[in-house]
Regions:
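Contiguous transmembrane helix-bundle modules in multi-pass membrane proteins
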Residues: 167, 186, 317-476, 724-767
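Active-site-proximal, structured, solvent-exposed surfaces of multi-pass membrane proteins
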Residues: 636-767
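Periplasmic/ER-lumenal interhelical loops and adjacent helix-loop junctions
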Residues: 20-41, 47-50, 214, 221, ...
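Membrane-embedded helix bundles of polyisoprenyl
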Residues: 98-99, 103-116, 122-164, 168-203, ...
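Transmembrane alpha-helical segments
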Residues: 106-113, 152-164, 192-200, 302-308, ...
Length: 767
């Protein structure tokens, strides 16, 4: 599936979208960060107490705590930690081998789970391949770290079955911990699914709920969560500040989707192979792209599962799938798999997919179950989608009629062709070899061949659909590594113009252009207050010149191809610097070093009443303080006169930059745990740092702890006395001490717990 592209790309496999912009960059960057290859240590001890190091990533947006920024992506992933045995510069070339490993682990876990439900273990192998190469798995290569979840979940479900049916101790707790560490966001959905799974098992009488079993599962659940909570408590405290949660005033939005097409897309996603993540074949409304909406099983679709459904009554698997279908169709229930996240996703479908695999292989193994009729039914449903290609459409603007609502006819034809072709092969094999020893081998071979061919086509559609923009990705990324060595020395930020995403991660520099969902939460309040959209990326427009001075941007980086566009679009304040390593550099003539003081402040109310488009200019003139901080720190500054709230032009911005530069830190150094600075003041004053506020920061001024003040609706300041001061900001994720303590206590408890039952089992065998 990956080999043709691996060869084509010379080992540096690149796909499209998130995979190119985030996954390659994150894996390579964090490999070096964990190994301490970035910024130097900062303040390491105060009054004999050691301080944390290697906790803060400057290259992540405006700077973010590394653990919270990457725990959603890779920080707890065993696959990422395994990759640390390789050198950092190998990582872009290891993305495919790591994906292969993840698919193998997914298949192994699915096999362990499924073998309980069939007599012939070859059917478990078949089911494992159906799961590993499901439409969900192939689709989510685009996101890469979602495949980690797909790989590890079956092991937890297998461990739950082992606890229920074989009374094994320790396995479930272990896999709960692994899955929680791997991804806290997906784990929330896994907990809900396990509850549905267990309730359905009990309600059908497939397992008997006793006090002993309940206690067993409760203890192991708590123990597993305790061992795996290392990342979740800091992440939870960080997420509390994140606005991407459910709107509790949604009303009907709780119960129904706003577009009929959303329902059709959900239903079709269970029977048809998936579209490319960023390219829909049919749908023009609803939230479809990037949602991971696919529950398709390779070759057979739902034919086997539906055959099982028709043949069984009162079965737990049917109840699980039926419950999941209801959850998929009701918005608030769907979002329950993601802690009531307000954005629509279908990224939990991999769990019912595993149950569908179990239903499929049970139907295939049972000679009494009719396989052909459901296959025909699924085929007719697939054919019914042809109506999208022939339905007459009236263009309201031209008054002309046309046929079809297809957005991408070529992709639709490929998806439909694979869907119908797979069913035809499935029916042929079932009719020719069912009941013979070679049946399962023939079907397995067909599933693998189909998965390989569809995977190549699916990835190819996504890859070459963006080839016009991504063909120079490898060149830009490798050139950035050269540029990193050739940039002038110093600790400042950069900006980019029409380059590939996340260039700052390759330069190990804080960059205003950043693509990532989980940067410091205060960024998500700072930028919107300036009228800059911040959802999953930061990309302030180049015309916002004042923001570059405020955030200490010294250089802007673009490509020769985009140089003229930049010069036409940019305002004054940029001066050509040099052409280096395939990039063109411009220097900010209004650069202000990090860490400076103000003479004036404005209240948050005044700031929020000001004109949004000139707020960046205002921030170069005055510090924004909350009413509470005005009472405490207002005496060190003067409230900005009203007449100075409006003369916010480029010329006055240049003057304000000169004033800030005249009162800036004489030294500023970025460290792997925050930053340190030196400043000489003629009076007590607040020193401002354009660094995202985070509860995890502790400030030290001349070795004494000082309060960190949140200013400008998301940045930081600290009070310093008159004269020379040394300032240190040290970061440790808020809540980490508590979660670390719980984990360190839980691990030896787990060892004793497992050891006790091992000893008890041996004792029983002797007697």
């Amino acid at each position: 599936m990956f080999l043709p592209f691996y060869i084509l790309d010379g080992g540096f496999f690149h796909y499209a979208g998130d995979f190119n912009s985030q996954q390659i960059s994150f894996y390579r960057y964090m490999n070096g960060f964990i190994k301490g290859m970035g910024y130097p240590d900062g303040l390491t001890s105060v009054n004999g107490h050691s301080l944390p190091t290697n906790t803060f990533s400057w290259a992540t947006d405006l700077g973010s705590g590394a653990m919270n920024a990457y725990s959603f992506y890779l920080y707890g992933s065993p696959f990422f930690w395994f990759s640390l045995i390789f050198p950092q510069h190998w990582l872009p070339y290891l993305m495919v081998p790591l994906l292969v490993l993840k698919f193998a682990v997914a298949g192994g876990g699915a096999y362990k789970y499924l073998q309980r439900y069939v007599q012939n273990q070859n059917y478990a192998v078949l089911g494992a391949c159906l799961y590993a190469f499901s439409g969900f798995s192939v689709y989510n290569v685009f996101f890469n770290h979602f495949v980690d979840v797909v790989a590890l979940f079956p092991w937890m479900l297998w461990a739950l079955d082992e606890a229920i049916y074989n009374k094994r101790h320790g396995l479930f707790a272990f896999w709960v911990a692994v899955n929680l560490l791997n991804n806290y966001f997906f784990f929330a959905g896994q907990v809900l699914f396990l509850v549905i799974y267990f309730v359905c098992k009990v309600s059908t009488g497939e397992c008997k709920l006793t006090l002993k079993l309940f206690g067993h599962l409760a203890v192991e659940s708590i123990l597993g969560v305790a061992m795996g909570c290392l990342l979740i408590w800091p992440a939870f405290l960080s997420l509390l500040q994140n606005p991407r949660t459910v709107d509790l005033s949604s009303g009907w939005g709780f119960l129904t989707y706003s577009h009929v097409q959303q329902y059709l897309a959900i239903l079709v996603s269970w029977i048809m192979p998936p579209d490319s993540p960023y390219m829909t074949s049919v749908w023009s409304e609803g939230i479809i792209k990037w949602t991971s909406m696919s529950a398709y099983l390779p070759l057979c679709s739902l034919a086997g599962a539906m055959a099982y459904w028709r043949a069984q009554k009162g079965d737990s698997m049917k109840r699980i799938v039926a419950t999941c279908a209801i959850f998929a169709l009701v918005p608030v229930l769907n979002s329950a798999f993601y802690m009531l996240n307000s954005s629509y996703y279908a990224r939990w479908y991999y769990m019912p997919v595993l149950i569908l695999c179990a239903m499929t292989i049970k139907a295939l193994e049972d000679p009494e179950i009719d396989l052909d009729a459901p296959a025909k039914g699924i085929g007719w449903l697939m054919l019914a989608t042809v109506v999208f290609a022939i339905v007459p459409v009236l263009d309201s603007s031209t008054g002309e009629w046309s046929l079809g609502v297809l957005k991408n006819p070529g992709q639709y034809a490929a998806v439909l062709g694979f869907g119908l072709g797979g069913l035809l092969v499935y029916r042929f094999i079932c009719q020719k070899w069912r009941g013979k020893k070679v049946f399962v081998q023939r079907l397995l071979a067909a599933v693998l061949a189909f998965s390989c061919m569809f995977g190549i086509v699916h990835i190819g559609i996504g890859k070459f659909g963006q080839w016009h923009t991504d063909s120079d990705l490898v060149e830009q990324d490798t050139n950035a590594l050269k540029l990193k060595e050739d940039l002038p020395e110093g600790d400042w930020r950069v900006d980019t113009y029409k380059t590939h995403d996340n260039l700052g991660l390759w330069l190990d520099k804080s960059c205003l252009q950043y693509f990532g969902s989980t940067a410091a939460p205060s960024i998500l309040s700072f930028y919107p207050a300036l009228g800059v959209k911040r959802d999953v990326r930061s990309e302030p427009d180049i015309t916002n010149y004042a923001l570059r001075g405020l955030l200490s941007v010294k250089y802007l980086i673009t490509t020769p191809e985009n140089q003229s566009d930049f010069e036409n679009e940019a305002d004054s304040g940029w001066e050509y610097y040099d052409t280096l390593d395939g990039y063109v550099l411009y220097e900010n003539t209004n650069y202000v070093p990090m860490g400076f003081t103000y003479d004036y402040y404005v209240t948050e109310e005044t700031y929020e009443d000001s004109i949004t488009t000139t707020r960046s200019n205002l921030l170069m003139r005055a510090l924004v303080l909350s009413d509470e901080d005005v009472e405490t720190y207002g005496k060190y500054l003067t409230e900005l006169p009203e007449e100075n709230l409006y003369d916010l032009y480029y010329e006055t911005y240049v003057s304000d930059c000169n004033d800030r530069r005249a009162n800036a830190c004489s030294e500023f150094q970025m460290t792997n745990s925050g930053f340190s600075a030196e400043i000489n003041l003629d009076r007590d004053n607040l020193v401002f740092f354009a660094v995202p506020y985070d509860d995890g920061f502790t400030a030290y001024v001349n070795g004494q702890e000082q309060e960190v003040i949140e200013v400008d609706e998301g940045l930081m300041a600290v009070l310093c006395p008159a004269g020379y001061s040394v300032i240190d900001f040290v970061y440790e994720a808020d809540g980490l001490k508590l979660s670390k303590t719980v984990t360190l206590i839980a691990i030896p408890v787990f060892v004793l717990y497992v050891g006790y039952f091992k000893w008890s089992d041996k004792k029983k065998k002797r007697h």
